[in-house]
Amino acid sequence: LALAAHLALPPGGGKNCPAVVIAHGFPSGPGGGANSPATFPELAERMAAEMGWVVMVPYLRGMPGSEGSFSLQGWRDDLLAAIEYLVGLPEVGAVWTAGFGTGGALAVCAGAADLRVNGVAALATPADFNDWADNPRRLLLHARKAGLVDESAPPKGFDEWKASLSEISAELAVIQLAPRPLLVVHGSDDEVVPPLDARLLSGTHGAGELRMISGAGHHLRHDPRAIAVLLGWLDRQQRELIY
């Protein structure tokens, strides 16, 4: 399975650079809409140029430029593959994951599963996917409309596809992630994912850093305050690792 990705490297390269995999959210329409991964290369290049980070933004399976069809398990596996790729680059030292919305939950799950990940930042992240699990065929229809799944046929192994919706849970994964650091950022006015989910994730982790963005909605990629919190946290993470 071949996936497209944007890889940003610091000017002049170097070795043992901090690195992060950033996971986009579930698209709100064809091409991604407000959750489009096309909005992330600019952020990645900024982080590489201003902070000296290696940044990878994978276009998860089913997204434009990438092969395959959407499944929750598949997207998690794509993030694990991205981590594996980053770790193998000569420029890369320590690795973190970050994500927005669905991507935030899967960044937690992938980070928990790979002990080489130093910490995770989760923004506008659902604690679980029970709403999807309760109505998988509605999700499948949404995925088709967004261009993530072949229009003509259901995903191969629909039962397995459906099962992953209840099996994959950021709330469970943060237990495995601890005591590695967790940042949880959420908009106080998020109407897609209840702010209670953010409190649940940070509380279940036990030492998660929770930052609520006053008046912000769900699409935190487009909120400068949320991005400032993310970049500040990553910078502190890297500095604490050095000292």
Labelled PLM ranges:
Residues 216-227:
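Catalytic histidine-centered segment of alpha/beta-hydrolase-like enzymes
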Residues 177-178, 184-186, 190:
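Short beta-strand/loop motif that positions the catalytic acidic residue
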Residues 39, 69-90:
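Alpha/beta-hydrolase active-site loop
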Residues 42-65:
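Conserved alpha/beta-hydrolase
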Residues 110-160:
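Hydrolase active-site cap/lid region
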Residues 191-197, 221-222:
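Conserved alpha/beta-hydrolase "acid-adjacent" motif
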Residues 1-15:
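N-terminal cap/lid segment of alpha/beta-hydrolase-fold proteins
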Residues 12-47:
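Short, surface-exposed "cap/lid" segments of acyl-processing enzymes
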